[in-house]
Amino acid sequence: MNNLIAIGYVLGTFGIEGWVKVEPLTDHPQRFLNTERVFWEKEDEIFPLRIEEVQLQAERILVKFMEINDIKEANKLIFGYLKIPKNEIVQLKENEFYLFQLKGLTVYDLNYQKIGVVRTVLKNPANDLLVIDTIHDKELLLPFIKVFVKEVNLPEGFIKVELLPGMLEEKK
């Protein structure tokens, strides 16, 4: 289901009554409090789950699903993703965007010379990294920081960046 976006990752179980520990993959973990249904997905398996109860913790979320009533059933959910339809994401302010929206955008330098296309965005402790497939069939990892990323234009489908000398040059 291509129209789904991950908002959580099931890390393990909690207690014996079917609760699971979830790592939030969203900047809005409180969204779990108002979400009634998610889709659980792992590899090629996917099915809907109805949220019964949620407890927000410091870095994790505890979730109880109506369909899961014991630890044995909860164990089957471990290492799966909790997803929602993209049309249910939290609406952002103007000039804000989600990282998944950057995938597929064309990357230009300040002179509008095409550099490549964003393949994906890697989450990194220091800063996120744009993975760009360049026009020279190379991969460029570009930190997603203001020093390099000068403009993101979702409506027109591009990102304007300023690279340091040598970032695109081939090594001899």
From Swiss-Prot:
Name listed for the protein in its UniProt record: Ribosome maturation factor RimM
Domain comment in the entry: The PRC barrel domain binds ribosomal protein uS19.
Family, per entry: Belongs to the RimM family.
Pfam entry (one): RimM
GN (gene name): rimM
Keywords for the protein's UniProt record, in alphabetical order: Chaperone, Cytoplasm, Ribosome biogenesis, rRNA processing
Keyword NAD: no
Record's subcellular location: Cytoplasm
Subunit structure: Binds ribosomal protein uS19.
Major location (coarse): cytoplasm
Residue ranges constituting the PRC barrel domain according to the UniProt record: 94-167
Biological role stated in the UniProt entry: An accessory protein needed during the final step in the assembly of 30S ribosomal subunit, possibly for assembly of the head region. Essential for efficient processing of 16S rRNA. May be needed both before and after RbfA during the maturation of 16S rRNA. It has affinity for free ribosomal 30S subunits but not for 70S ribosomes.
Taxonomy, superkingdom: Bacteria
Organism of derivation: Carboxydothermus hydrogenoformans (strain ATCC BAA-161 / DSM 6008 / Z-2901)
Organism phylogeny: Bacteria, Bacillati, Bacillota, Clostridia, Thermoanaerobacterales
